Regions:
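Intrinsically disordered, low-complexity regulatory segments
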Residues: 1-171
Length: 171
C-alpha cells in the first residue's frame, strides 16, 4: 500500500463518507513512513502505527495494520497541576469541545466529581479541571478515562478508490 497510496494520505489521515461507503485512514508520522518505505524496498519487515499530531497516548494492540475490524484506543494526556487541579494538555482526536462536553455530562450524571472546567485552548489544548474537595485527583483521572471522551476507540477503515472501484486495504 505504501506505493499505491500517496504518502500525504497516510501522513495526514483522511475521513470521509460517500453513498454506501466510508473511509477512515488514521494519520501516521512522516519520518516513520519514509523509514517503512526504505525497509519495504530492501525487503525488510517493518511496523507502522498511527501517530496523532496533536499528541496523547495510543494503544495499537488491536490495530491490525489498519484493516477493517481493527481498533486503536487513544487517550488524552492528563497532568496533575496540584492536588485539586488537572490539565488536559494533549488530545489525539483534536476534538477538545467534545471532551469538555463529555466531562460536564459525566459530572452531571455523578460519574465524576468536579467543581468546574475551564477551556483555555488556543493553539494548544489546555482544559483545566478543578476537582471537588472530597475526591482524589487519581480517582478523577481514572473516571475521566472511563466515562468521558478522554479515552475513545477509533476503528480504521482504509477504503480507497482504485480503477474506479472501492478497495479496502491495510497500511
Amino acid at each position: 500500500v505504501l506505493f499505491e497510496l500517496d504518502a500525504v494520505l497516510l501522513a495526514q489521515g483522511v475521513e470521509g463518507i460517500a453513498v454506501g461507503l466510508a473511509s477512515k485512514i488514521l494519520p501516521h508520522n512522516f519520518n516513520e513512513l519514509i523509514d517503512a518505505s526504505i525497509a519495504y524496498l530492501r525487503g525488510e519487515s517493518f511496523e507502522l502505527y498511527p501517530d496523532f499530531p496533536s499528541g496523547g497516548l495510543c494503544d495499537v494492540t488491536r490495530y491490525n495494520d489498519g484493516l477493517r475490524g481493527g481498533a486503536v484506543k487513544v487517550r488524552a494526556r492528563i497532568n496533575k497541576i496540584d492536588k485539586r487541579t488537572l490539565a488536559i494538555t494533549e488530545d489525539p482526536t483534536h476534538d477538545d469541545e467534545s471532551i469538555k462536553e463529555s466531562i460536564i455530562k459525566a459530572n452531571d450524571k455523578g460519574k465524576i466529581k468536579i467543581k468546574k472546567v475551564d477551556d483555555n485552548t488556543s493553539d494548544q489544548v489546555e482544559i483545566i479541571i478543578h476537582v471537588s474537595n472530597d475526591e482524589s485527583s487519581d480517582r478523577t483521572i481514572d473516571a475521566l478515562y472511563a466515562f468521558t471522551d478522554c479515552e475513545v476507540s477509533i476503528s480504521p477503515n482504509a477504503c480507497v478508490i482504485m480503477d474506479e472501484k472501492p478497495h479496502f486495504m491495510g497500511v
